[in-house]
């Protein structure tokens, strides 16, 4: 089997490494020559994962046509804000009747489209039944280190879901399939917003009680907006929901938690983002999530406060204080 991977960031590289480790021939699309040379000559992604050796069956190319055309499966892993542009570039080369697996997370700024909506808008209908979406608690470095990991595979087509599940499943990588595309996407996107809040709490020196509170109430917000969009509430108790939320809010490798932590320590958002080599999806997703909650008429207190902190300059300490001063209410999820 020959597989093309679109996106040479840490997660796309990790998924490519996993598939190559299984014995598949994998080619990774990179945008710069030095990265291509480093992967092909030294088996190292010098930009994103410089301390890890990649399998020999994983190669790289700058030629998008070479990466996509004639492949038996396509894995798409660009940042969500770049996804539309990438899909427009690749669709003339896309093979028909092969699985297309998205690992992007986020909600598009402006249009407020979920990743699945972007795919279905940009690609002809003949590709739609072959689309699937991978999400779950999975740091890239730990996948490459072969640490036992679980993820969700969501597709509206059961045949596609089961095929992708079988291709990705390995000794250290277990997959669960679900038809709930919306639930998997909402969980994978909004957990990054909550992780920003958890990082701020840690940066301010608050304890684990506060982090647990943010995770708990964050799951409430994720579930509320998911239900409004038609998701199955049980999805949010699975890998792409609670699993990914816990990892992203607590793990030191979490880019979104790191951004929040540094904000809590007093750095500006501009300083933080200019120093990072990877994309923290939660920053852009916060804006989309805030606008989506306003559009749907859903109260999302944590999301609203993170938005005010990122885009209106609100002091992080005031954010936490205002969350604690909110009106008392009954526990539960209602939309």
Swiss-Prot record:
Catalytic residue list: 191 (proton acceptor)
Keyword Oxidoreductase set for record: yes
Membrane spanning residue stretches: none
Ligand binding (sn-glycerol 3-phosphate): 105, 136, 138, 191, 244, 254-256
UniProt GO BP: carbohydrate metabolic process; glycerol-3-phosphate biosynthetic process; glycerol-3-phosphate catabolic process; glycerol-3-phosphate metabolic process; glycerophospholipid metabolic process; phospholipid biosynthetic process
EC id: 1.1.1.94
Compartment annotation: Cytoplasm
UniProt keyword list: Cytoplasm, Lipid biosynthesis, Lipid metabolism, NAD, NADP, Nucleotide-binding, Oxidoreductase, Phospholipid biosynthesis, Phospholipid metabolism
InterPro entries the UniProt entry points to: 6-PGluconate_DH-like_C_sf (IPR008927), 6PGD_dom2 (IPR013328), G3P_DH_NAD-dep (IPR006168), G3P_DH_NAD-dep_C (IPR006109), G3P_DH_NAD-dep_N (IPR011128), NAD(P)-bd_dom_sf (IPR036291)
Pathway info: Membrane lipid metabolism; glycerophospholipid metabolism
MF-aspect GO terms: glycerol-3-phosphate dehydrogenase [NAD(P)+] activity; NAD binding
Chain positions recorded as NADPH binding sites: 10-11, 31, 105, 140, 255, 279, 281
GO CC terms: cytosol
Reaction equations catalysed: sn-glycerol 3-phosphate + NAD(+) = dihydroxyacetone phosphate + NADH + H(+); sn-glycerol 3-phosphate + NADP(+) = dihydroxyacetone phosphate + NADPH + H(+)
Keyword Transcription: no
Name of the top EC class for this enzyme: oxidoreductase
Family: Belongs to the NAD-dependent glycerol-3-phosphate dehydrogenase family.
Reported function: Catalyzes the reduction of the glycolytic intermediate dihydroxyacetone phosphate (DHAP) to sn-glycerol 3-phosphate (G3P), the key precursor for phospholipid synthesis.
The protein's name: Glycerol-3-phosphate dehydrogenase [NAD(P)+]
Species: Leptospira interrogans serogroup Icterohaemorrhagiae serovar Lai (strain 56601)
